[in-house]
């Protein structure tokens, strides 16, 4: 089975959707997600500064509505709605998370909690919401792994 086949099989399994650490190249994930018709968002957290930095990057990338309140509750609300991005599913690829987590551990951990809750909410509705967390080789974020 090729990597693409494995990714297509994985992305089609809504019950497994959630937040994962992955070393799979973002281009491979993107290609598989496009094949199954998902919205794809690559978000670089490398020089994001704390809570405001991650909130702003996610909001901008996912084109959150103007009413987004720029706090964790508002992030949770928008991620569990996504009506303006209706589709078969969503894939977020968060890159350079090792840098962000090292400099802003509390904000990283809270963001992962919010993303996991959003994924669980979408799983209940049978819509896949995937988050692939990426960082430098050797970094261990304590998340379930999907590796090449």
Q: What are the language-model segments listed below?
A:
Residues 2-53, 127, 142-147:
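N-terminal intrinsically disordered, cationic/polar leader segments
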Residues 8, 27-31, 55-59, 109-112, ...:
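Generic detector of well-ordered alpha-helical segments enriched in charged/polar residues
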Residues 19, 23, 69, 105-108:
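Generic detection of long, well-ordered alpha-helical segments
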Residues 29, 33, 62, 79, ...:
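Hydrophobic, Leu/Ile/Phe/Ala-enriched alpha-helical segments that form helix-helix packing faces
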Residues 42-44, 93-96, 132-134:
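Conserved beta-strand segments of the P-loop GTPase G domain that flank and frequently precede/overlap
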Residues 44-48, 52-88:
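Conserved helix-adjacent loop modules within structured domains
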Residues 80-107:
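Mid-chain, well-packed structural core segment of small domains
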Residues 100-138, 142-147:
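Helix-rich interaction surfaces within compact, conserved domain-sized segments
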